[in-house]
Design a protein with these regions (language model features):
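Long amphipathic alpha-helices with heptad-repeat character
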Residues: 209-212, 216-219, 246-249
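N-terminal interaction modules that seed assembly of large macromolecular complexes
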Residues: 21-74
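Short helix/strand-capping connector loops at secondary-structure junctions
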Residues: 158, 176, 221, 225-230
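C-terminal accessory module of base-excision DNA glycosylases/AP lyases that mediates lesion recognition
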Residues: 1-40, 90, 101-128, 132-210, ...
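Charged, low-complexity interaction regions
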Residues: 211-214, 224-239
């Protein structure tokens, strides 16, 4: 991936996920924010992604995690700002994910850490003192979309990222890195996650378009049936409105080369 493509990915992600106030701040010269504020904001964005299942389950142990949110974020903030991984990012990452002080499972930790680095990857050049990390060492955030991609690639068959074990996670991590080594499109796992995320969005849209096309075909068949039975539908305002919308939708569908 060339530098222009990489920057486009970063800019699009910032545009989609950062609030208006922070998007404005990032364009300011001189900067009106401290590095710590921006890093804290990145972690605050990553946190909801990590605890989505925790909030849904709402068990007593998970409630403890929610109550310790600020302590957990501070723990990761301190590690990131100190570049605590040194020369061995994988070992540091494993130790962080294995931390049981706050009741966090390995799978939840990986999501929080990896999403935090995804945000930092996008804004590192906006910091006065950049985080000293080789982003090629970073891991892909495991979620429903990336696990589906890993399933399709034969890397793993697990379905729940929040319950991943350390051994399962390491197999996935290594499998993803092997895929990257054989892929000239991306340089690291974070770039791959951007593309997997986009591909999933495209697939969802195409699926909806396909369903829409099938539904329109069925609607046309039903209307033809009533007309064949002698019902006067042309003077029915509701039916006319539906037919007009069908014509518009057909134009959109015609643009799709995937159907």
């Amino acid at each position: 991936m060339n530098s222009q493509q990489e920057q486009t990915l970063k800019n699009q992600f910032i545009e989609l996920t950062f609030n208006k106030e922070w998007r404005k701040k990032l364009d300011e010269t001189p900067k009106s924010y401290r590095d710590a504020e921006l890093i804290e904001y990145c972690l605050s964005k990553a946190w909801p992604d990590a605890i989505i299942y925790v909030r849904k389950k709402n068990s007593p142990s998970d409630s403890i995690i929610l109550g310790k949110a600020e302590e957990i974020k501070q723990c990761l903030f301190d590690a990131i700002t100190a570049s605590a991984w040194g020369d061995d990012f994988d070992t540091w990452h494993d130790n962080m994910c294995s931390n049981t002080d706050f009741g966090m499972r390995y799978g939840v930790w990986q999501k929080f850490i990896n999403m935090s680095f995804k945000y930092i990857y996008c804004i590192n050049d906006k910091l006065n003192s950049r985080i000293r990390v080789d982003f090629n060492d970073c891991h892909i955030p495991l979620d429903d979309n990336t696990l589906l991609w890993c399933n399709n690639k034969g890397i793993t068959d697990i379905k729940a990222w929040n319950d991943v074990t350390p051994d399962e996670y390491k197999r996935i991590r290594d499998g993803v890195h092997n895929e990257i080594e054989n892929n000239s499109t991306v340089d690291n796992a974070l770039q791959l996650e951007f593309l997997v995320w986009r591909i999933k969005k495209i697939c969802d849209v195409l699926k909806n378009i396909k369903n829409l096309k099938d539904n329109l075909d069925g609607l046309e068949t039903s209307i033809s049936f009533f007309e064949d039975c002698g019902f006067d539908l042309e003077n029915n305002s509701n039916v006319t409105a539906v037919l007009n919308q069908m014509d518009i939708l057909k134009e959109y569908i015609a643009f799709s080369k995937f159907l």
